[in-house]
């Protein structure tokens, strides 16, 4: 998500150090201490303006959530929502998603969300896609055994690429939606991102998948 630079965003994050973790590497292997409990931890890589992560946290107080984004202004808008909702189970990190293993110990995370990631459509940018094999290796490292990735996008090309990438990596595709918003059974539990709300209003198809890592043979 690209947004204009927000005046005072840096100061805002610094003033809310109880939510935005200034030095996340300090908590590697100790995130339960940061949250003050041993609840499962889910992370969203590329959290945008925070509608999804705060919505999930409100619905599931029994789960801890970490919102991750590398854009200062974007994360400040997500912080707005977290402050307004007063959610004790949300933390935030201003870091690059490619470096997750620097901040989380092996097996420390239970689930990864990838929502409306940049599709990087040009072939020379394939390695930047968040479902490229090097990213999958990082997720596998920080996730518990058989940990899961939940992925949503409006981009058919990225979705098809991701299906192949995950399958080639040896992941099990548990569920696949080719038109998520037509699934009335799933609708009550679907928390939408800002992009998803906008695309849904325009009638665009939303794709979704759930996949898990399998034990190495």
Curated annotation (Swiss-Prot):
CDD domains in alphabetical order: AdoMet_MTases
GO cellular component: tRNA methyltransferase complex
Active site location: 118
Protein's UniProt name: tRNA (guanine-N(7)-)-methyltransferase
Protein EC: 2.1.1.33
Major enzyme class: transferase
Gene3D superfamilies xref list: Vaccinia Virus protein VP39 (3.40.50.150)
Statement: the UniProt record of this protein carries the keyword Plastid: no
Catalytic activity: guanosine(46) in tRNA + S-adenosyl-L-methionine = N(7)-methylguanosine(46) in tRNA + S-adenosyl-L-homocysteine
Keywords carried by this UniProt record: Methyltransferase, S-adenosyl-L-methionine, Transferase, tRNA processing
UniProt binding sites for substrate: 122, 154, 193-196
Sample GO molecular function, one term: tRNA (guanine(46)-N7)-methyltransferase activity
Species this protein is from: Lactococcus lactis subsp. lactis (strain IL1403)
Family as reported in the entry's similarity comment: Belongs to the class I-like SAM-binding methyltransferase superfamily. TrmB family.
Residue positions binding S-adenosyl-L-methionine: 44, 69, 96, 118
Annotated region (Interaction with RNA), positions in chain: 124-129
UniProt gene name: trmB
Record-linked InterPro entries: SAM-dependent_MTases_sf (IPR029063), tRNA_(Gua-N-7)_MeTrfase_Trmb (IPR003358), tRNA_methyltr_TrmB_bact (IPR055361)
Keyword S-adenosyl-L-methionine: yes
Purpose: Catalyzes the formation of N(7)-methylguanine at position 46 (m7G46) in tRNA.
Pathway membership: tRNA modification; N(7)-methylguanine-tRNA biosynthesis
């Amino acid at each position: 998500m690209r947004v204009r630079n927000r005046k005072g965003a840096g100061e805002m994050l610094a003033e809310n150090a109880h939510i935005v973790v200034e030095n996340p590497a300090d908590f590697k292997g100790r995130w339960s201490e940061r949250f003050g409990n041993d609840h499962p931890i889910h992370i969203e890589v590329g959290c945008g303006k925070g509608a999804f992560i705060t919505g999930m946290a409100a619905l599931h107080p029994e789960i801890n959530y970490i919102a991750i984004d590398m854009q200062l202004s974007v994360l400040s808008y997500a912080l707005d929502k977290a402050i307004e909702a007063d959610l004790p189970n949300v933390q935030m990190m201003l870091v690059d998603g490619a470096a997750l293993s620097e901040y989380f110990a092996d097996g420390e995370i239970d689930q990864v969300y990838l929502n409306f990631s940049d599709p990087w459509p040009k072939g020379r940018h394939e390695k930047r896609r968040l479902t490229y094999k090097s990213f999958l290796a990082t997720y596998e490292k920080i996730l518990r055994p058989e940990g899961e990735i939940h992925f949503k996008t409006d981009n058919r090309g990225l979705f098809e690429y991701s299906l192949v990438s995950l399958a080639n990596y040896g992941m099990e595709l548990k569920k696949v939606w080719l038109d998520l918003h037509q699934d009335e059974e799933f609708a009550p539990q679907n928390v939408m991102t800002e992009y998803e709300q906008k695309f849904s209003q325009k009638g665009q198809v939303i794709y979704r998948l759930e996949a898990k890592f399998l034990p190495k043979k």
